[in-house]
Amino acid sequence: MPKSHRPHGRRLSTLTVVLSIGALLGGPAVASAANDTAGFITQAPAQLRPLVDGVDVKPLLTVGEQIGSYRFESIPDGIAIDPRGHTTFDLYVNHETSKVPFPFTPATGIGLVDFDNAQLSHLVMKRGSGRILSGEYAIPSSANYQRFCSNFFAGPEQGWSRPLVLTNEEATDFVNRTGTAWPAGAGAEQAGLAVAYDPATGAFRSIYGLGRMNHENSVAIPGYGEAVLVTGDDTFSAPASQLYMYKAANADGVWNDTGHLWAFQSDNAAINDYGDLSGSASVSGHFIAVPDAIADGDQTGLETWSNANHVFQFIRIEDLAYDRNDHHIVYFADTGEPRAVRNAAGLLSRAPAGTEGPFPNGRIFKMVLDETDPTVVDSLSVLIDGDAGGYRNVGALHQPDNIETTENSLLITEDPGGHNRFAGATNARLWKYDFATGDMTAVAVVSDPTADWESSGVVDASQYFGNGAFLINVQAHNVFVETNPTPVNPAGLTQKREGGQLLLIRIEGA
């Protein structure tokens, strides 16, 4: 049975002090609980702005601000909302931080590193206003997880009698799980795990059976009478990504890791990778069982097994979401890769930097699962083809990253690659795709027009804020709220706390 952890001192920090974060974020952000409206809300400028009428943006919490002893840490990413709240509710925010330096030059010891390992924030928020009443770290830095990306709250809506927050490491590094995470020593293990957090007990544990890969998200699909999770490999070595499914008897089976991993395989050997699908074409398929030893092993073993067993090869799978009107439909983003080209054998491979291949912008895929057996795929097709827009096209979707669905729309965040930062380009946008009409509209963009910023973690918050309301994060990568020479790691490393913000966005008609 997997070992679970309970962080010490889990009492929530209530609002007593707010930290000024300085001119880099537009001046000090100061507020007090001793006013006519309880709870904290940032006074920093919004890091996201509307692009069309009918869109309203409200900043809620900015990196570096404190609520009691809790500080909102850098690189906020996935957001999961507990739907069981009333006048207040719980939300869980991932932090994509790591104490493994990146970038890093081993020969010189020069590089950048975050102050903390990955963490999962637990915030209590007021319905309607978005004011934050308290905060804590549900999964602390001391757990030595790396780069939490997207997350998902699985509960009654997905048929889970035991609610769990599922979070995910997007990392390949070998790290120590106790003590100092890096550099790796004896007994270190490779990162790339899915992690389950139990809100009822505060315990968390690694779910090794969900596979070791660059997990972006693990999303629970309702309607099958068992726990069904879909996940993908957000590989750093694109094009080398696969779509996986984890099945267990129920939520307890996920918690105890008694489920098994499955991998998607096409029914047509001639349509077996990202480039084989285009236009309105589709292919059926099925998920094949992955041996437990492979699923529990390292990332190289899983990649090797997937190639040997002709698992469908995507380029770089990002976030996933199911259709709110038909739960058997799953949408997922693939960010594309300009260096992805076919080699002499006709297989997708990675060409040198500067290559302008046929897949520069990415896609949104649509997968229709069988209504009774989730391992049977009725069809896989391309819903939105950003690649068709070509290079240096402002109007094209650029590197889709996080996604969310409502009954009406699909919301898509961008994380543009360097090749999409051309003269005249816009910065990272939030798009709305209308299911009824197929129209794509860019509804918001990060506030800095040129810097390395992205929006992330978009999640439907209409239950607590009304129709068309979402929570979303911004990662302001080039804004360093705080830096410090590292006291114990090799000379030349600088600790940094990147800027970012949690916001409420309302989108009319979404």
Region annotations inferred by a language model:
Residues 5-33:
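Secretory targeting and sorting signals
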Residues 31-510:
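Sequence/structural signature of beta-propeller domains
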